[in-house]
Every structure is written in structure tokens, then in C-alpha cells.
Amino acid sequence: KSRSRGLGDVYKRQPVHASNSAELAKRLSSHEMIEKVIHTSLEAHPDYDIAQKVMPKGSGMLAFIIKGGDQAALKFMKSLDIIFEATSLGGVESLVECPFNSSHMFVPEEVRHEAGVVPGFVRMSIGIEDVEDLWKDIDSGLNSAKKMMIEMT
């Protein structure tokens, strides 16, 4: 039998997904290109208390809003080297998507905004790669987006 997306060993991997994701959320929170970070490990998250009870080891899902809107988000995503663009999240590798041009492409803009999918919104499924490698990739992508924004002014 084949196991879809490595479900047979997910219990071994989940702590790495969660710790990587929490560390990246923390670092993103202080990055100049980030408007908002959405991750249940952050006390500012509206569901922080519930998340601590329901999933105390955390989650590998991470979302954030990049300053500069959708163009900056796309530049960020296209500039990544080890994190791959995908619309199906949740494997061993780190994946990224900009919902406005993938999963929510055909959802009316007003409805997207009501759901929190605002300009610059990025969603990631953090994998089990080395967290320092992931951060270097993310920081480099954010710097590429910043450079693009400066060049546009």
C-alpha cells in the first residue's frame, strides 16, 4: 500500500513542522516587509489559547501579509529557492502559495477580503528542512520584494 503524503510517519515529523513554523513566525513578526503574521504560536493570534489546548505541539501552517500587496507577494514567492510554489500544502517539503492567484482565484475580491485573503496574503506549509536554510530563503525572497518596490517608486 502507498501512503498519501507520508501519513505513516507524520507523527514523527509533526514536531519539526511545528517548531520550524513557530520559529519562522517569530522571525517574520519583526521583519520590516511584513504587515502581519498569522500563526497560532503567537500570543496575538485570536485563537492562541484554544490552540495551546487543542494542538499544544503546534502547526506547520503559517500565513502572513507582505507590505506591497499582491505584486510584492508574487515577487517574494517567485524569488524563493528551496521553498516551492504549490496549491496543495502539507508534505515533507516547505511549500508556498498566494491564494489570490491560486486557491481563491475565482472567489470575488470582496469575499476574499472578508475571509482575510487581502492583498499581500501568503500561505505556507512549513516542512522539515533546516530552519536556518528556510529563514535565509524567506529573508532573501522578502528582500527581493523590497527591492522591486523601491524600483517601482
Task: Show which residues each predicted segment covers.
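PLP-dependent enzyme catalytic core of the Aspartate aminotransferase-like
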Residues: K78, S94-T153
